[in-house]
């Protein structure tokens, strides 16, 4: 099985938070991966060395500062009534709405959705902000969200 139900996700409450409702049509498009599939994706797209962003080290592309181009702040926008992602992110990422994206929290926790759904529900996803990395399928652009309210936009090497 490639996915688990949203209800079985450890922190499923983030997608059911009353102050940040998600459309019924978007919920089925938020697909937590089963552990085995998450492990394979993490190893392929994020790191073969470590299982969590806190432990990135030399040899992990996210550890290399040259892969990150700019930094911005997300927390103020997250706390506001503004619904759109920070402009730096939407300027850096020009993906089609149907692009498959992966929100990678750690080796065992990867959530697949589309770019359109992520843009609409980003505030829900950012309840998990501990260095999580957003990457697109067959795309080089990436974003890392940090718990201090900042993010970095960059390019994942081929």
Predicted regions located by residue number:
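Structured alpha/beta or helical-core interaction and ligand-binding surfaces enriched in interleaved
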Residues: 1-150, 155-158
């Amino acid at each position: 099985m490639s996915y688990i139900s949203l209800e079985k996700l450890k922190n499923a409450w983030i997608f059911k938070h009353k102050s940040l409702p998600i459309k019924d049509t978007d919920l089925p498009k938020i697909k937590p991966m089963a552990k085995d599939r998450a492990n394979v994706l993490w190893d392929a797209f994020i790191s073969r060395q470590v299982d969590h962003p806190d432990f990135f080290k030399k040899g992990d592309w996210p550890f290399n500062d040259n892969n990150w181009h700019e930094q911005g702040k997300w927390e103020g926008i997250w706390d506001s009534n503004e619904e759109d992602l920070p402009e730096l992110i939407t300027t850096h990422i020009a993906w089609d709405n149907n692009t498959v994206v992966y929100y990678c929290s750690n080796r065992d926790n990867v959530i697949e959705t589309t770019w359109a759904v992520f843009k609409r529900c980003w505030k829900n996803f950012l309840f998990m902000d501990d260095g999580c990395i957003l990457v697109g399928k067959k795309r080089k652009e990436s974003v890392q969200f940090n718990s201090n309210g900042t993010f970095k936009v960059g390019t994942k090497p081929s």
